[in-house]
Curated annotation (Swiss-Prot):
Negative regulator of class I heat shock genes (grpE-dnaK-dnaJ and groELS operons). Prevents heat-shock induction of these operons. Keywords: Repressor, Stress response, Transcription, Transcription regulation. The keyword Repressor applies. Belongs to the HrcA family. This is Heat-inducible transcription repressor HrcA. It holds the Pfam family HrcA. InterPro entries: GAF-like_dom_sf, HrcA, HrcA_C, WH-like_DNA-bd_sf, WH_DNA-bd_sf, WHTH_transcript_rep_HrcA_IDD. The keyword Transcription regulation applies. GO terms for molecular function: DNA binding. It comes from Chlorobium limicola (strain DSM 245 / NBRC 103803 / 6330). GO terms for biological process: negative regulation of DNA-templated transcription.
């Protein structure tokens, strides 16, 4: 980052201002720091340090207060160079394991329900808006295809993707088909496409089926529908959100216009998904202390409506596929706790999905 190096005193005072403000949501003054923290500095000295921090843009003074609050620049310096993320403690770990295990069991343990449960638990534990994006299917490996004949002109196509995910599509047919015709086409598709990525299938499907001798009408219908069958799942259909009630309850969003903007953003699920998915691509995104968590703060976010939010994003893994797990909240956030919980939840999700039957 381009910010100047701070002295030890400045780091200490900036850290205290941020930690105090995160807890109280109230501006922090020099007298409060002198009385409550044993820095060996007088009120006047702390005031001078805070003046230097303000001059450099790390803290600012709200119009109606004598205290100071962190700026985006201050939070960024704190996240990059001051905060220390400890391992998740046993109590938090037990709570996450218990809540996640119970929800997953109650919801039958399918991949979809596991993702929903992860969003629910992450929102509850972090007290922020939680977002889970299921893995993109672009590079997913096709395993097999099944067709269920619903009528002579209607069938359901079920795609099995390696690493446990399914895609189900109902197709209306302009031809009448028999069970034997369906079985023949399924056998050919599975023989010639299994083990390929969806990208490879879309690119080479016509060539791979060009010498097929089975019923051409049904096969032609499959080829014409290949964009729908083998294409990427829309981002909005990969999104699981929970915890909106927690973020709306934050002091930052008490003003009606801010609540409206926040609700509008949350309801635009495509924007929320992109915020989490794009967080790792943001210029200022960092991964603190070797942890695979990206953090974008305030105006670093591309979306204007997220200008007062912090977005944390981390990957989780399902075989060869990668999904995203995220937390959205005000910039006044307990960053250490958020990173700690997000990392552990990503590990839980990766492990659980690898065990889904």
């Amino acid at each position: 980052m381009d910010s100047p190096e701070l002295t030890l005193r400045e780091r200490q005072v900036l850290g205290i201002v941020i930690q105090s403000y995160v807890v109280s949501a109230a501006p922090v003054g020099s007298r409060y720091i002198a009385r409550n923290y044993n820095l060996g500095l007088s009120d006047a000295t702390i005031r001078n340090v805070m003046a230097d921090l303000e001059r450099e843009g790390f803290i600012s003074q709200p119009h109606t207060s004598a205290g100071r609050v962190p700026t985006d620049k201050g939070y960024r310096y704190y996240v990059d160079l001051i905060m220390h993320v400890q391992r998740i403690n046993d109590e938090e770990k037990r709570r996450i394991d218990a809540d996640f295990g119970q929800l997953t069991c109650e919801r039958k343990g399918t991949s979809t329900e596991v993702l929903f449960s992860a969003a629910k638990v992450l929102g509850t534990i972090s007290r922020q808006l939680s977002v889970v994006l299921s893995p993109a299917f672009s590079n997913a490996v096709f395993e097999k295809l099944d067709m269920v004949l619903l009528s002579s002109s209607r069938m359901m196509v079920i795609l099995s993707i390696r690493s446990l995910f399914l895609r189900t599509i109902v197709m209306e047919l302009d031809i009448e088909v028999s069970r034997q015709m369906v079985d023949d086409v399924v056998a050919v598709l599975n023989e010639r496409l299994s083990g390929l990525t969806l990208v490879e299938i879309r690119r080479t499907l016509v060539v791979r089926l060009s010498d097929c001798t089975c019923d051409s009408a049904l096969l032609d219908r499959i080829v014409r529908s290949s964009g729908e069958l083998f294409d990427e799942t829309p981002m909005i259909e990969r999104l699981y959100i929970s915890g909106a009630e927690y973020i709306i309850d934050q002091p930052e969003f008490k003003q009606p216009e801010k609540v409206r903007d926040l609700i509008s953003m949350i309801e635009d699920k495509t924007s929320v998904a992109k915020l989490v998915d794009d967080a790792t691509a943001a210029v200022e995104a960092v991964k603190p202390q070797g942890m695979d968590v990206s953090i974008t703060i305030g105006k670093e976010n591309i979306e204007r409506k997220a200008g007062e939010l912090t977005i944390l994003s981390t990957p989780y893994y399902v075989g060869d596929m990668v999904g995203k797990l995220g937390i959205l909240g005000p910039t006044r956030m307990d960053y250490e706790h958020a990173v700690r919980v997000l990392n552990y939840m990503a590990d839980c999700l990766s492990t659980t999905l690898s065990e889904v039957p």
